Swiss-Prot record:
Region of interest (Disordered), residue spans: 62-92
Protein name (record): E3 ubiquitin-protein ligase makorin
Lineage: Eukaryota, Viridiplantae, Streptophyta, Embryophyta, Tracheophyta
Coiled coil: none
Low complexity compositional bias, start-end: 62-74
Length: 323
């Protein structure tokens, strides 16, 4: 056994430095499984992290005896708390290194399914999640428990939706949409005003074809091929909905995603978007502020109110014919 710390990458079989590694590759050497990202409060894995979530020493009372520090970390939470209580009763002046149960990490093996150490495991075993069936809920971290529960329910809901969508066929090509050859074709094209299923490729080809001369675009291309109801846009989705509420949620998520993408026609204020206020994409100028939508209302001779698009001076001057 050497004095070096065991390489954490070697433990997981992923060290790329080999013999040139400055850490030890001897499994008998002491490991250092403390998560440095957690100490900086930037660990993104939470309870799923494979390393120990222990706060930095500056945030905790310092111990005068390094041996007691090692002993407190290596013992189980329940055993450590019991030792702490005994020390406090026997010697009021002793300086005990105290760690709140919230700081103990849960066992990654138990969280994944089964811990080979059982009751001898030095880590805390989490509570059972009723959704995923894993013991991954930390008993003393309510925020993590709530976050995991919501995320787990969301994943389970998505899996159930995928199962229900397996047998849905396209109303045009009559193929099962989720059984198509390429991943890009395995998407539904949802129409906002009807519930007929289409694959995204078929409905887009239908709406992009050239209209017959003299026929209205809305009645020929933007209408559903089956029921002829008019839908102004198509929503791509990897699952098929089972209720109007689920359909509305899919459409809202799609619109919210488009609102985060800059409109190529608006071009940060240098272009002109033909869709105007109806555009789903973000109309933002180069300095970051959003375009202020101002609708122009014009009254006709028949008493009707018409909303007109904004007219630029360059477009007006470009349309003049000077003889």
């Amino acid at each position: 056994m050497s004095d070096r710390i065991l390489c954490k990458f070697f433990v997981h079989g992923s060290c790329l430095k080999g013999e040139n590694c400055e850490f030890s590759h001897d499994s008998k050497d002491p490991p250092n499984n403390v998560c440095t990202f957690y100490q900086k409060r930037i660990c993104l894995y939470g309870s799923r992290c494979r390393y120990d979530h222990v706060r930095a020493a500056s945030n905790l009372p310092l111990s005068s005896d390094s041996e007691s520090l090692d002993r407190s970390i290596s013992t189980t939470p329940s055993r450590h708390l019991q030792q702490q209580g005994d020390n406090n009763d026997g010697d009021k002046s002793s300086n005990v290194y105290c760690i709140h149960p919230r700081e103990y990490p849960i066992c990654s093996f138990a969280a994944a399914g089964d811990c080979p150490r059982g009751n001898q495991c030095p880590h805390m075993h989490g509570d059972l999640c009723n959704t995923c069936g894993k013991k991954c809920l930390h008993p003393f971290r309510p925020e993590e428990r709530e976050e995991h529960t919501k995320e787990c329910e969301k994943k389970q809901k998505h899996i159930e939706a995928l199962k229900q969508s397996q047998d849905i066929e396209c109303s045009v090509c009559l193929d099962r949409i989720l059984s198509k050859a390429t991943p890009g074709e395995r998407k539904f094209g949802l129409l906002t005003e009807c519930d007929h299923p289409f694959c995204i490729q078929c409905i887009r080809n239908w709406r992009s074809s050239a209209p017959v001369s003299g026929m209205d675009v809305n009645s020929t291309l933007r209408a559903c091929p089956i029921c002829r109801k008019l839908s102004y846009f198509v929503v791509p989705s990897v699952v098929w909905y089972s209720s109007p509420e689920e359909k509305k949620e899919i459409i809202d998520i799609y619109k919210a995603k488009l609102r985060s993408i800059d409109c190529k026609h608006f071009n940060f204020g240098n272009g002109n978007c033909p869709f105007g206020a109806s555009c789903f994409y973000k109309h933002a100028y180069s300095d970051g502020h959003l375009e202020e939508v101002v609708l122009r209302h014009l009254g006709s001779q028949e008493g009707e109110t018409v909303i007109t698009d904004s007219i630029r001076l360059s477009e007006f001057l470009g349309g003049l014919q000077i003889f």
